[in-house]
Amino acid sequence: MGKIADCLMLWIPLLLGAIFLCSADPQNNQAPLQLSVGNPLTAFTAPTAFQSGVSHIQSMRSNFDTDVLVSISQGVQDFALDLLQRISVEVEKANKDFMISPFSVWSLLVLLYEGSEGETRNQLKKSLRINVEDEKLRGAYKVWSSFLNITTSTIEVATLQAIYTGKGYPIKNNYRDAIQNYNVQPMEVDFYSPDSVIQINEDTNRTTRGLIPYTILPQDVYGAKMFLLSSLYFKGQWKFPFNKTLTREEPFFSESGEVIGKIPMMVQEANFAYVSNVEGLDGYVLELPYGTQDRLAMIVVLPKRGFKLNDVANNLKALGLRPILQRLAAFRNRASEDNEVEVMMPKFVTATDFTLKGVLIQMGIRDLFDENTANLDRMSSGLFAKLVVHSTKIIVDEQGTTAGAVTEAALANKATPPKFLLNRPFQYMIVEKATGLLLFAGQVRNPKAA
């Protein structure tokens, strides 16, 4: 007689992502167990306001080894750029825009790492670039969550890790203790009742402020054992808002130089930092800051003539963000206050849904998805992952972000401002600059107007 699987699903919103974990116990004939990544409702009912940029982060680090935090942040960044590059390859033929939240995916998988043993744990550790002991990893996450959950007049960031468990389903005490370090308190629900779907969707809707309102269907969780939720919400006003009266219809070009169509292009002239010669990148870099604290920014990379988005994504994977952020910081330090740049950028809305199982297997996380080899015994007995789903949405307009001819971003003569024309495919990353954490990343190939 064949095995009857019990499953666990993970879901992530504004991210929304999900991993479907199953039990291969032949004596257990109950319905699937699910893990979901969603929004920050219960864990952070009132995100803490941050003080001033770097000084706040330094205060959060006062009781934590800065070198360890930098090392772990670098690991998250390496995972993020690896994931971004692989998805870029996947979507190139479809010629579609996409957006992901690498930090939310990483955070969700860390919950599984905490529950894993043996080779499953080794594969997760290697892929997630975890290079420290568990206690230091947990400490780093506490620091991140403290300054990522912020609310000001110009920026709002909120995170959530949540675990819903079926009535009577056991979670091992050591795992329950471990996940408290990620601000997770398991919530017991009845996965056979429609009320569980209502609760998860309401949590997701509230955390993502309505961006991803109703993602879970009754059949997704019916009879589940566990549902893990990890989400990240971001809304930021540009430091230099675009003037709506200047927005105009302009052609947008494909990578081959063909006109895709006319779309609303925003125009702004301000003191933006830019870099045109990062060695090995093959792209021009522009920084669009959010708010007034100089902590969060959209980093835009426009491929140089003769190079494609996949080239840039592959180069970023090798280079990392550090040299780019250092070059941008050096530009800001030496640039005069009247060093203005003219930026033309499309308004766009991107909503994407990914099944990440194949990509994660490519990244070396194999045993997690194999009922014969998966080892999540620190969490509960006999589970394996069935599915990983990731849903995102981003809106970019004149106020900011809520998650002609083909031209290079060449510098004009000194009589006129340099021009950065984003009228052809480009890549963007929303970054917490002090740590280098890559919160969101995506590509615009065929924009839909906001």
Swiss-Prot record:
Keywords, ordered alphabetically: Glycoprotein, Melanin biosynthesis, Protease inhibitor, Secreted, Serine protease inhibitor, Signal
Glycoprotein keyword on record: yes
Record's GO cellular component terms: extracellular space
Family stated for the protein in its record: Belongs to the serpin family.
Cystine residue pairs: none
Compartments it resides in: Secreted, Extracellular space
UniProt gene name: Spn77Ba
Protein's job: Serine protease inhibitor which plays an essential role in regulating the tracheal melanization immune response to bacterial and fungal infection. Acts by negatively regulating a protease cascade involving Mp1 and Sp7, that functions in the activation of the Hayan-phenoloxidase (PPO1) cascade.
Name used for this protein in its record: Serine protease inhibitor 77Ba
One MF annotation (Gene Ontology) recorded for this entry: serine-type endopeptidase inhibitor activity
Database matches in PANTHER family: GH21475P-RELATED, SERINE PROTEASE INHIBITOR, SERPIN
GO biological process, one term: regulation of immune response
Annotated signal sequence range: 1-24
Annotated glycan sites: 149, 205, 243
Disruption phenotype: RNAi-mediated knockdown results in spontaneous melanization of the tracheal system in larvae and pupae. Displays melanization at the 2nd or 3rd larval stage and affected larvae die a few days after it first occurs. Melanization is first detected between tracheal cells and the overlying cuticle, then increases in intensity and spreads to the epithelial layer of the affected tracheal cells. Increased expression of the antimicrobial gene Drs in the trachea and fat body.
